A protein has these predicted regions:
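CBM-like carbohydrate-recognition segments
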Residues: 2-30, 37-91, 97-110, 134, ...
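Carbohydrate-binding/catalytic loop surfaces
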Residues: 11-19, 34, 85-98, 125-142, ...
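Alpha-helical scaffold elements that line and support the substrate/ligand-binding pocket
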Residues: 32-33, 143-153, 229-236
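Inter-helical turn/loop segments and adjacent helix faces that build the functional surface
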Residues: 46, 150-161, 235-246, 295-304
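Extended ligand-binding groove/face enriched in aromatic
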Residues: 53-57, 61-65, 69-210
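Catalytic cores of carbohydrate-active enzymes
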Residues: 177-182, 261-272, 302, 311, ...
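Oxyanion-binding "anion nests"
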Residues: 227-273
C-alpha cells in the first residue's frame, strides 16, 4: 500500500471502482449509496483536504450527485439474505435526519407502515415474510437504523421505542452468552428439523455455545455480527440521552470487548469469528472497525483499551485493498451456507474478490477513520498506522 495515501484516498479508490457499477445488486446498493453520501458530507465538513495523495475531490458536487441519485429512486428493495424489503432507502432517511433532504413525510409514513404492517414472528420481531419466522441480523440493519432516523426526524419517542424493542428482542434470541457473540439468524421449526449438527461444528476459540432453540444458526458469522453492530451503533447515535441509551452503550461495549481476543495478530477478524481456522474476512472486520471508530469518536469506549486494536485493524484491512479499489477476502452472500449455517459451513464458504456486500462496510469504516483523524485528531495517519502495525 502506497504510504502517500490516507484513509480518504482508500475511500475514493473503492468508491471510484464500485460507485457507478450498474451490476451491483440492489441488495448491496442501498448501503453503498448510504456510505457514498455520508462520505461526501464528511468531506464537506472538513477544513482541509483529507487526501494525502494530493488529489482533489469536489465534496459538494459528490454530495449533490449522490443525493440526486438516491432521491430519484426510493422504491422498496430486498436485502442480502432475506426476503424482507427495506422500508425506505437508508440514505434518503439519513439525509432527512441531517436536514439534507425534504422527505420527512415519506420517512415517517414508511416507519408507520413498518410498525403497523411489517411482518413479525411470534415475539413481535420483524422477520422474513417469504419464510415467516426466519430471523436475520440483516433485518436489524434494515429496520432499526431506519426507525431511529424516523425518531430523529419527527421527535416522536414511539419510533425509538420500537427500534429499541426490536434490538433487545433480537439479542434475546440470537446473542450467545457463552460465546459472547451473535448468531446470524434463526430458522423456522420446519427448516431446523432438516439441520444435522456435527461434532466438527464446534469453533476452536469458543467451543462452548448456548443455543436456546434448535433453530438458531450455530455459526458465528463475522458479517452477521457486523449487521448487529451497525444497527446498534446507528441507534445509539440517534437516541436521546437517558438511561436507555446508557444501557445500549454498555451492550455495545460488551459486544466489542468480546471481539478483542478474536482479532488475529494481523488485525483481522475471521469469517467464523471464534475460529481462526476460517479465513480473515473483510466485511466483518470493517463493520467491527466502524463500530469501534464511532465509539472512539464519541468517547463511549475506553481509548486505552480499544485504540491499539482499532489501529491494528485499520492496517490489516488496508492490506486487503488494491490500488484499483478491489477488495479481497469478502464473505460469500449467504446467511445459511450449506443449508445449515454452522461454523464449518461458514468456514468452507469460499471468500470472494469484490463481493458487493463488502463495499459499504469498508467505505463506512474508512470514512469513520477520516473523521477520527482529520476532524477529531484521535488517530494517526494511515502511513503511520501501517508503519506501526506491520503484520506477521
Amino acid at each position: 500500500m502506497d504510504l502517500q495515501m490516507d484513509y480518504a484516498d482508500l475511500c475514493m479508490m473503492v468508491l471510484e471502482k464500485f460507485g457507478d457499477v450498474p451490476n451491483i445488486p440492489l441488495s448491496a446498493r442501498m448501503l453503498l449509496e448510504y456510505a457514498e453520501v455520508r462520505l461526501a458530507k464528511i468531506g464537506m465538513n472538513l477544513e482541509k483536504s483529507p487526501l494525502a495523495s494530493g488529489k482533489t475531490v469536489g465534496w459538494d458536487a459528490l454530495f449533490e450527485t449522490s443525493a440526486a441519485k438516491i432521491l430519484a429512486v426510493r422504491e422498496e428493495r430486498t436485502g442480502e439474505t432475506v426476503g424482507i424489503i427495506w422500508p425506505f432507502h437508508p440514505a434518503a432517511a439519513w439525509m432527512c435526519a441531517r436536514k439534507k433532504a425534504e422527505t420527512a413525510g415519506e420517512v415517517t409514513a414508511a416507519a408507520d407502515a413498518l410498525i403497523k404492517e411489517g411482518h413479525r414472528d411470534r415475539d413481535g420481531l420483524f422477520d422474513n415474510p417469504v419464510h415467516p419466522g426466519q430471523l436475520s441480523t440483516e433485518i436489524l440493519a434494515m429496520t432499526v437504523p431506519f426507525l431511529a432516523w424516523a425518531g430523529k426526524i419527527s421527535g416522536e419517542k414511539r419510533y425509538f421505542d420500537e427500534a429499541v424493542r426490536q434490538f433487545k428482542g433480537y439479542a434475546a434470541r440470537l446473542y450467545d452468552p457463552a460465546a459472547r457473540l451473535w448468531h446470524p439468524g434463526y430458522l423456522t421449526a420446519e427448516a431446523a428439523a432438516a439441520v444435522t449438527f456435527r461434532p466438527t461444528d464446534q469453533s476452536i476459540l469458543s467451543p462452548v455455545l448456548s443455543l436456546p432453540e434448535p433453530g438458531v444458526l450455530a455459526g458465528c458469522w463475522g458479517r452477521g455480527e457486523g449487521y448487529a453492530l451497525f444497527a446498534l451503533s446507528e441507534l445509539i447515535f440517534e437516541l436521546p440521552e437517558g438511561p436507555e441509551k446508557e444501557e445500549l452503550i454498555r451492550m455495545r461495549v460488551d459486544m466489542l470487548d468480546s471481539l478483542l481476543p478474536l482479532q488475529d495478530p494481523n488485525g483481522m477478524w475471521h469469517q467464523v469469528l471464534n475460529d481462526w481456522g476460517s479465513y480473515p474476512e473483510t466485511s466483518g472486520t470493517a463493520w467491527i472497525l466502524y463500530a469501534v471508530g464511532r465509539g472512539l469518536k464519541k468517547g463511549t469506549v475506553d481509548r486505552e483499551k480499544f485504540l491499539p486494536p482499532y489501529l491494528c485493524g485499520l492496517a490489516g484491512m488496508a492490506r486487503y485493498l488494491a490500488y484499483d479499489g478491489s477488495i479481497f477476502n469478502g464473505s460469500v452472500t449467504c446467511i445459511c451456507p450449506g443449508g445449515r449455517g454452522t461454523a464449518v459451513d461458514f468456514a468452507f464458504a469460499k471468500w470472494l474478490k469484490d463481493e458487493p456486500h463488502t463495499v459499504a462496510p469498508v467505505l463506512l469504516s474508512l470514512q469513520q477513520a477520516v473523521q477520527n483523524e482529520c476532524a477529531k485528531g484521535l488517530i494517526p495517519s494511515l502511513s503511520e498506522v501501517l508503519n506501526q502495525f506491520t503484520g506477521e
